[in-house]
């Protein structure tokens, strides 16, 4: 794949990511203001997450047969449709009708998100070259920049809601993304990532032990984040602390932007160490941080002290989570074969989406049952399971072939 096509794929992915982050904040804050319960708000996002599971499985297979450029264009188009559809929901509707309608529209957005993400991340494999160092750095830059832009999207969504209202914000995003779609569709050329061998449909579930184990770890890692992030923390900031739309959106935006920045610089932070050892060490560190935040909330400190403990603790959580996520994003490409990269990545991100679905549901349920404290204990348990799963990750193919595994003397290590 030439660099021009890669730039177009990445630009399309970035534009989509802005609308994706903004839409999440729009929906969450809008329906919280309408008086929907934490569980009802969680259900609004379940269609989005559930379709992500299916899309990653099937989308990777479709991408390998038709080319990643086509899956990207379809993803952008579906997001435009979802944004416009959401603008037709009326406040006068019964709550159950609104929940079902928004879930359905969000399901389209979930398909769109994972088609574009799978397309962009799989494309990295075809432009990075054979060196693991280049691959890791390009994955880190793409993933980090995506999350930074998603954070900007969070703030953008909150700002658009406060300034223009729900419907106008949706239409504005649909128009901008439509322009992006036209540019990408007319300028993108070739069949990016099209497999030379037509893999059968059953290949979407035929994975190596390494990919299965990494996917299981990814499931629990992302579920652990969304347990506190998706519903519990925003409602806590809005209802308990009384923050404004700008405050809630601003903090979540800053968190995701910082998280993305750390991901982009992950190769520098991690140094010259084995990816597998680093994944184990940083997941254990994340579990300890989660437990400390939960203990601080349970300690019945003053409101100001509790707020400082939660917010500062979650900032540290974000740094360590970003390192874990970046390591996983590198490992899936390192474990993948060139001719199966889109199906391997699709399977892996279907596990990611399944984790987000479970985390989203638990975020609403645990917050309803025990507030932010119980949500944080749920996070701790899921991160601990992630750590246990990383203990069984095998060496990457490059490491297995390496006659000199010492990272201090081998110049070909990924973290250089």
Language-model features: locations:
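Helix-loop boundary and gating motifs at the non-cytosolic
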Residues: 1-50, 212-252
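Juxtamembrane intracellular "pre-TM" segments in multi-pass secondary transporters
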Residues: 1-3, 187-224, 239-240, 410-416
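Hydrophobic core of transmembrane alpha-helices in multi-pass small-molecule transporters
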Residues: 14, 82, 95-116, 307-323
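Conserved MFS/SLC helix-loop-helix module at the cytosolic interface between two early adjacent transmembrane helices
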Residues: 53-91
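Helix-to-loop junctions at the C-terminal end of transmembrane segments
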Residues: 55-68, 161, 261-278, 367
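C-terminal ends and interior cores of transmembrane alpha-helices
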Residues: 77-95, 286-303
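Cytoplasmic helix-loop-helix junction between adjacent transmembrane helices
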Residues: 105-146
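C-terminal transmembrane helical hairpin of 12-TM major facilitator-type secondary transporters
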Residues: 278-328
């Amino acid at each position: 794949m030439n660099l021009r096509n890669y730039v177009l794929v990445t630009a399309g992915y970035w534009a989509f990511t802005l609308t994706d982050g903004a839409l999440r904040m729009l929906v969450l804050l809008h329906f919280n203001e309408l008086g929907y319960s934490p569980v009802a708000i969680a259900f609004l996002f379940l269609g989005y997450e559930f379709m992500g599971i299916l899309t990653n499985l099937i989308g990777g297979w479709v991408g390998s047969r038709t080319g990643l450029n086509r899956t990207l264009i379809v993803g952008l188009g579906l997001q435009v449709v979802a944004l416009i559809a959401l603008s037709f929901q009326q406040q006068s509707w019964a709550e159950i009708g609104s929940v079902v309608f928004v879930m359905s529209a969000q399901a389209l957005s979930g398909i769109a998100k994972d088609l574009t993400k799978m397309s962009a991340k799989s494309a990295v494999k075809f432009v990075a070259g054979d060196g693991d160092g280049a691959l890791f750095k390009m994955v880190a830059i793409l993933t980090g920049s995506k999350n930074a832009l998603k954070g900007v999207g969070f703030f953008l969504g909150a700002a658009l809601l406060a300034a223009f209202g729900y419907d106008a914000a949706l239409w504005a995003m649909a128009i901008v993304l439509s322009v992006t779609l036209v540019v990408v569709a007319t300028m993108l050329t070739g069949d990016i990532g099209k497999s030379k061998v037509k893999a059968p449909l059953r290949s979407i579930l035929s994975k190596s032990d390494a990919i299965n184990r990494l996917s299981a770890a990814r499931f629990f890692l992302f579920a652990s984040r969304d347990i506190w992030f998706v519903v519990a923390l925003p409602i806590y900031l809005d209802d308990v602390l009384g923050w404004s739309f700008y405050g809630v959106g601003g903090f979540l935006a800053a968190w995701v932007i910082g998280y993305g920045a750390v991901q982009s610089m992950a190769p520098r932070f991690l140094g010259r160490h084995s990816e597998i050892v680093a994944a184990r060490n940083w997941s254990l560190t994340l579990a300890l941080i989660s437990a400390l935040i939960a203990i601080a909330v349970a300690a019945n400190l003053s409101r100001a002290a509790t707020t400082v403990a939660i917010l500062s603790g979650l900032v540290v959580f974000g740094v360590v989570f970003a390192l874990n996520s970046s390591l996983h994003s590198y490992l899936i490409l390192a474990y993948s074969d060139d001719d199966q990269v889109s199906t391997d990545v699709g399977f892996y991100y279907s596990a990611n989406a399944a984790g987000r679905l479970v985390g989203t549901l638990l975020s609403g349920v645990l917050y309803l049952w025990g507030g932010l404290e119980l949500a944080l204990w749920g996070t701790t348990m899921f991160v601990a399971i992630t750590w246990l799963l990383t203990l069984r990750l095998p060496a990457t193919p490059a490491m297995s072939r390496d006659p000199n595994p010492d990272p201090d003397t081998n110049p070909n290590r990924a973290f250089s």
